[in-house]
């Protein structure tokens, strides 16, 4: 199984990339994390947020791995603890499908994409920069894996 992070946004600053890379390189080969950056749509010329999100949805759908479980990150999603993520991970591995976590653009994710998602997940109740979400998600995936392996990284 492979974990994909599809993120609408521009190239991130070096410190974000460095933090993200730190956690992705710690993951075992059977749970590699792959980042797919999706170029955001411009919101210019009176273009509505709805049309921007719809255009970004098309780009996201084109980048989604075929048959992948879709986990959409959204401020109105379910609030999972790290332990809940760790409990979900083995089940996802057993069903054999890749998992794609989607981080929307500045206006969020298109409602059609959210309705199609297998899971709507909230990373935080706080508003976070999208680059920071990449790092936090990668860290939480590593932490969840470490819990399933009784690795000393996670100390509860």
Curated annotation (Swiss-Prot):
It is found in: Cytoplasm. S-adenosyl-L-methionine binds at residues 73, 104, 123-128. Keywords: Cytoplasm, Methyltransferase, rRNA processing, S-adenosyl-L-methionine, Transferase. It catalyses: pseudouridine(1915) in 23S rRNA + S-adenosyl-L-methionine = N(3)-methylpseudouridine(1915) in 23S rRNA + S-adenosyl-L-homocysteine + H(+). CDD domains: RlmH-like. The keyword S-adenosyl-L-methionine applies. GO terms for cellular component: cytoplasm. GO terms for molecular function: rRNA (pseudouridine-N3-)-methyltransferase activity. It comes from the Bacteria. Transmembrane segments: none annotated. Disulfide bonds: none annotated. Its EC number is 2.1.1.177. It is an enzyme of class 2 (transferase). Homodimer. Belongs to the RNA methyltransferase RlmH family. PANTHER family: METHYLTRANSFERASE (PTHR33603), RIBOSOMAL RNA LARGE SUBUNIT METHYLTRANSFERASE H (PTHR33603:SF1). Specifically methylates the pseudouridine at position 1915 (m3Psi1915) in 23S rRNA. This is Ribosomal RNA large subunit methyltransferase H. The lineage of its organism: Bacteria, Pseudomonadati, Pseudomonadota, Betaproteobacteria, Burkholderiales.
